[in-house]
Amino acid sequence: VHTIVAVENVSLDGVMQAPAGPDEDPRGGFIRGGWATPYLQADPEAAMAAFTGRAAHGAAPGGMLFGHRTYDDVVGYWLTTTEPNPFSEVLRASPKYVATRDPDVELAWPASFPLVGEAIQTVARLREQGDGDLVVLGSGALVRDLAAAGLVDRYVLTTLPVVLGQGTRLFAGTPLDLEVRWSTTSPSGIVTTEYAVRRP
């Protein structure tokens, strides 16, 4: 069985909307897009902590899972950037599963596979069909739906020292009992923590 791991950048007030760029996701009148970028550019150790930390604590690669919007934004950017970086290498090497309701979806990047239908059902089937970690990047609506269905097993949260005061929050109404698996603090004070979801 796959383990589903949500990897997110969050503010101190729990916002995860549009961390990378000003035009990434302006829905709801959000004007703080790109809020995480200055912190992570100034602290490369923090920018990769979710992945280096997971590797150091025995992560088992199984693939990546995206909502359709995040797939287009994230994969499109990181697979076209000309700057060498380890994240692009991880993306290229990983199978990429995309939850979508569009039966005619065309996915632009190699090793990309559509999960067509209702995400809770398609992801639940995928979860039962393999092993290793399925890492969800961003994809806030997908993560919240999966959490409500009890399908998220772990969260790796990189918490940045900023309060945004607006924007979509990662956790929205689903109570969770979490256990810290590991935590690391970068030189600039950015904290990355992996939490396991405790099941009843």
Annotated model-derived regions:
Residues 1-200:
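Enzymes that bind and transform nitrogen-containing heteroaromatic metabolites
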